[in-house]
Amino acid sequence: MALFQAMSMVAQLGYYEKVAGVLGFLSIALLFWKLNHKPFYPALPLAGEPPQRRWFSLSNRLRYYNDCAALFDEAYHTAYAKKGKAVLVPSMGVHTAMIMPESAMNWAMSQPDDSLSIKKAFSELNQTKYSLGHGRYWEDPWQLDLVKAHLSSILQNLIPQLNEELAAAFSKHLGTDAENWKEIELEVIMRRIIAQATSRFIVGLPLCRDDGYLDLSYKVILGMVTTIWATLPFPDLIRAITGPIASWQTRRNIARIQEYLEPLYQERISILESRDGPESDPEPQDLFMMMLRFAQKKRPDEYANLGIMTRRVCAANFVAMHQSTVSVTNLILNIIGSDAEFNTTATLRDEITQVMRGTDAKSWTKDTFTRMRKCDSVAREAMRLNFPLGTRGSMRAVLKDGLESPEGIKLQKGTTISWLASCAQVDADRFDNPQKFDPFRFSRASKDDDDDGKSTSSHAKDAFVTTSPQYLPFGHGKHACPGRFMVDLMFKILLAQLLTHYDLGWPEDYQGKQPPSVWQGELSEPPPGARILVKRRKV
């Protein structure tokens, strides 16, 4: 009750009173933290600071928010990360991040999970103990581990489902008018299309086409992002205050999602508990059914708790929907933006037509999409330039004291290490004209090797799903994201549906120019409100 009274009082304050209150609160919090905090790895250099400096200046702290790309580029190129040395960089709020050199990547990927943990790192990053009420959804993310365990069967079942769902979503949201151009706000529409397509895999029909459920699902995702921004900048003492406040509406929306899931939950429980046939008896093939089947045997306490199962669905939605929406938005903008120079749209259509000729979705396999090398190249190039996780990649949390890096740094328990992934992906020593979107950069490389008889190995090396220390959108090593194979399928089916059935262009006021991405701290995001024109093709 006291919390609601406090929130009501805050709501009655004027704008400037609120700003003054927030600044005063943060000033006290930062002063308290400064007086009680020891330097973070005092022997390591600080990016952008003179030697022997042990604290980041206020100006460098502010650079994290208004010039982060340049600051991190300095840390990568000047003397540290690219040259085999760890370096410290400013992070959100009062925090400092440790950047490891690329030379330490293989060492880190070989460490056991009880020494370096990707799960703990993402639990800290996503702050789900506030937004979802517990850290278990990332520290024990079995809802995601199931995808890796059943990947082959999932992919083959997913192909016709994704094709059907994307076709329905495009018709609904882009329309079927073949005479007139329609202007859309791209990210808003892609959010709805991706939510529908991924929900076909996560909860199946008919819920994946329920607008109320899909809108709530994305509200929860945006609420989770809000909670991250409201907690990560602060020390734990302050997070305990800001976290519950920031996630209050998210918890209400999760309760409403639970109402949508309850009939489905009861139906699936009935199937599982009444069946007496072999494991191969037909069942729904969506992720929710897989989750219930697993929980029945391995997590009976969660199996019996719809609230926990609902939150695991929300965690799966966060992974599947949010990053895919951002990446697809960037992909489409890059295709339109490069069309005048590279004839991108027509080239992709030709490849799609050649690969799909004489087939239908029921006969498509993973190999069908492997042959789409130009589509693959476009997707990889878009991901290279628009790193979906910010600037840093392959985060690992240190779980025990005494672990020593190849450089001789004794890592402390609780430290999170990472790599400057986006800097490595635009390194001029590796790429010609690295800041330019070159849609067929990777398909040209594999074609050159085709002529030398190296086609299979070359294409695999440069494929969208192939990870390396220089390409980290999906991480690297044994914990590389297994969902990347599903993303690969979805992107290619999406391109096939979109480019086969629609013409694309810029609104007249864009004067043929692609709007630039924007930076928020270390996140590069699609231009807010970016619009495109679409028109159904007469095919």
Curated annotation (Swiss-Prot):
Induction: Expression is positively regulated by the cluster-specific transcription factor tenR and is induced during cocultures with the natural competitor fungus Metarhizium robertsii. The gene is tenB. InterPro entries: Cyt_P450, Cyt_P450_CS, Cyt_P450_E_grp-IV, Cyt_P450_sf. Disruption phenotype: Fails to produce tenellin, and accumulates pretenellin B. Also leads to the accumulation of pyridovericin. It comes from Beauveria bassiana. It is found in: Membrane. Keywords: Heme, Iron, Membrane, Metal-binding, Monooxygenase, Oxidoreductase, Transmembrane, Transmembrane helix. GO terms for molecular function: heme binding; iron ion binding; monooxygenase activity; oxidoreductase activity, acting on paired donors, with incorporation or reduction of molecular oxygen. Belongs to the cytochrome P450 family. It comes from the Eukaryota. One of its GO terms (cellular component) is membrane. It is a single-pass membrane protein. Residues 439-460 are annotated as: Disordered. SUPFAM superfamilies: Cytochrome P450. Heme binds at C481. GO terms for biological process: secondary metabolic process. Cytochrome P450 monooxygenase; part of the gene cluster that mediates the biosynthesis of tenellin-type 2-pyridones, iron-chelating compounds involved in iron stress tolerance, competition with the natural competitor fungus Metarhizium robertsii and insect hosts infection. TenB catalyzes the selective N-hydroxylation of the 2-pyridone nitrogen of yield tellinin and 15-hydroxytellenin (15-HT), respectively. The pathway begins with the assembly of the polyketide-amino acid backbone by the hybrid PKS-NRPS tenS with the help of the enoyl reductase tenC. Gene3D superfamilies: Cytochrome P450 (1.10.630.10). The chain crosses the membrane at residues 13-33. Its EC number is 1.-.-.-. Its cofactor is heme. Pathway: Secondary metabolite biosynthesis. This is Cytochrome P450 monooxygenase tenB. Its main location: membrane.
